[in-house]
Amino acid sequence: MKQYRILIAGAGLGGLTAASCLMKAGHQVEIYEQAPQLGEIGAGIQVSANAFHVMRFLGIEDRLLARGVKPEAYVFRLHDTGEVIQRFSLSQEELHGAPYTQLHRADLHDILADRARQADPGVVRLNHRVTGFTETADGVELNFADRPSVKGDILIGADGVKSVVRAQMF
């Protein structure tokens, strides 16, 4: 299998997960993050069985379970009487082969960042604000504000809701 040099714009949940999966497959990966340090804001996040299979593939299942919860069901009640009006089960682990879990977004981000850095301590390059990219005959060049460009075979845009990569593509 050919080894690719893969550039990832963004060190959020998607970028870190993609990086770890690609490194596990034997590729050279570099993540470029605009922030001066890694940190994730937000509240709770749900990890469905499908996503949990990916976390298991990365070997971080135990860390997720230690920091998260596995709710049994969603229960909807009337506010004034407490009467249950709807209930649906979330614990269908036997059916899907993995649990449904919930944890704090920052905890998931920390776990994913640790996993990526275990594979390559220098995988995340901070203070790299992406300004765009250029497709070349042999790959792609990722451009930054106040930094030299870098070249790779493949570019993954995981740079968030205000994605510079996506905006240039569409």
Language model segments and positions:
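Glycine-rich NAD(P) Rossmann-fold beta1-alpha1 loop
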Residues: 12
